[in-house]
Amino acid sequence: MATFVQKPAEVEKKWILIDAEGLVVGRLASLIANRLRGKHKATYTPHVDDGDNVIVINAEKAVLTGKKYTDKKYYWHTGYPGGIKERTARQIIEGRFPERVIEKAVERMVPRGPLGRRQMKNLRVYAGSNHPHEAQQPTVLDVAKLNNKNTRSA
């Protein structure tokens, strides 16, 4: 019996909606990365984009555990000498684009390269509860029920 190899034309992508309110960012990002890559499917093939389309709402209400909210730093370089910049997770979450915390967490869990970039285009993250993808009829995935560690205990 030969090994099954998924062909790009045979891929069936579903739309999944995840509400990030109260969920831990790292655990959420890990689950999203697996869904984007298609590793939850029996037809997973490493070189084919057979993951699902993922919509994340309420990204601004996702939580970080421990002291990551104040201590975690995101670095980037401008390209100029001495151009290293940093911003804390708190500054990003309280800033204009709080959804970037989840986007960066997922981006760093997906392989770097042409396939990883294509898979990241299947991720849509929104800070609020509104999204323009009602026509796709996404199925709701309740991440909090999958494992009680996925939510922050008070």
From Swiss-Prot:
MF-aspect GO terms: mRNA binding; structural constituent of ribosome
A GO CC annotation given for this chain: cytosolic large ribosomal subunit
Function (record text): This protein is one of the early assembly proteins of the 50S ribosomal subunit, although it is not seen to bind rRNA by itself. It is important during the early stages of 50S assembly.
Family: Belongs to the universal ribosomal protein uL13 family.
Ribonucleoprotein in keyword set: yes
Keyword Ribonucleoprotein tagged: yes
Entry keywords, A to Z: Ribonucleoprotein, Ribosomal protein
PANTHER family with a match to the protein in the record: LARGE RIBOSOMAL SUBUNIT PROTEIN UL13M (PTHR11545:SF2), RIBOSOMAL PROTEIN L13 (PTHR11545)
Protein name: Large ribosomal subunit protein uL13
Subunit structure and binding partners: Part of the 50S ribosomal subunit.
Lineage summary: Bacteria, Pseudomonadati, Pseudomonadota, Alphaproteobacteria, Hyphomicrobiales
Pfam families in alphabetical order: Ribosomal_L13 (PF00572)
Organism: Sinorhizobium medicae (strain WSM419) (Ensifer medicae)
Swiss-Prot/TrEMBL GO biological process terms: negative regulation of translation; translation
